[in-house]
Regions:
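Conserved nucleotide-sugar phosphate-binding/catalytic loop shared by glycosyltransferases and other
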Residues: 5, 22-66
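Short amphipathic alpha-helix
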Residues: 8-22
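Nucleotide-activated donor-dependent transferases that construct or modify glycoconjugates
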Residues: 1-8, 187
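Glycosyltransferases and closely related glycan-assembly transferases
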Residues: 44, 74-85, 91-105, 119
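A nucleotide-sugar donor-handling region in carbohydrate enzymes
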Residues: 128-194
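A conserved, positively charged/aromatic
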Residues: 105-107, 114-129
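Short beta->alpha connector loops at strand-helix junctions that form conserved
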Residues: 51-55, 107-111, 130-131
Length: 199
């Protein structure tokens, strides 16, 4: 199994699956994009991986990176001989699998990623989406009752660590808000924008 990870969240999404597959005797090869803390997380979980691609800003650089990642993953897959390739919103695994006559399984939960989905879906063998995903990708689509985050935050897999609050100088009953800022440079951000009003 070859799994390509393009985002830190993908490490969390796939980690339990990888451990389960390895327990069952499967060999899993991870390729990973150097984006934010993706490589650090893989190292923290003691996963071996091959870095492919690096985050750069701008649409042209994104397309250029996709082409280069396709070529890198193609070379790696030719040497590894996976039975199938997996990723999240990942055109490279779909393209490479098609070129090598292998199967690809792509997860996505981002309907508005029209460009990324448009260059991925036609080549993917299986497209897994949450049941709330309105877009109909045709007979290749498998809908599941859940969300990506349940792959790593489900109570069977996750126990909160209250020590984290202490590190932040918070008590368990303190109210707090988490705000995530983004650059709007990701493939699923093409044609999107954030809050335009000055706050």
């Amino acid at each position: 199994i070859l799994i390509d990870m393009g985002h830190p969240g993908h490490v969390h999404f796939f980690k339990n699956f990888i451990w389960e597959m390895e327990k069952k005797g499967h060999t899993v090869l991870i390729t990973a994009r150097n984006k934010e803390i993706t490589l650090d997380l893989l190292s923290k979980y003691h996963f071996d991986f091959i870095p492919v691609g690096r985050q750069k800003s701008g649409k042209f650089n994104l397309i250029k990176e996709w082409v280069l990642r396709d070529l890198q993953i193609l070379k790696i897959a030719r040497e590894f001989h996976p039975d199938f390739l997996m990723g999240i919103g990942n055109p490279s695994v779909a393209h490479v699998a098609k070129l090598l006559s292998k199967k690809s399984l792509v997860f996505t939960d981002t309907e508005h990623a029209k460009f990324a989905n448009g260059v991925t879906f036609p080549f993917a063998d299986v497209i897994c989406t949450p049941s709330c995903f309105n877009y109909d990708a045709g007979p290749k689509q498998v809908r599941y009752n859940g969300y990506h985050e349940l792959a790593y935050l489900h109570p069977n897999r996750f126990t909160p660590n209250p020590d984290v609050l202490t590190e932040l100088d918070l008590a368990e009953d303190d109210p707090f808000i988490i705000v995530r800022f983004v650059s709007w440079q990701a493939s699923h951000d093409v044609g999107q924008h954030g809050i335009r009003d000055k706050v």
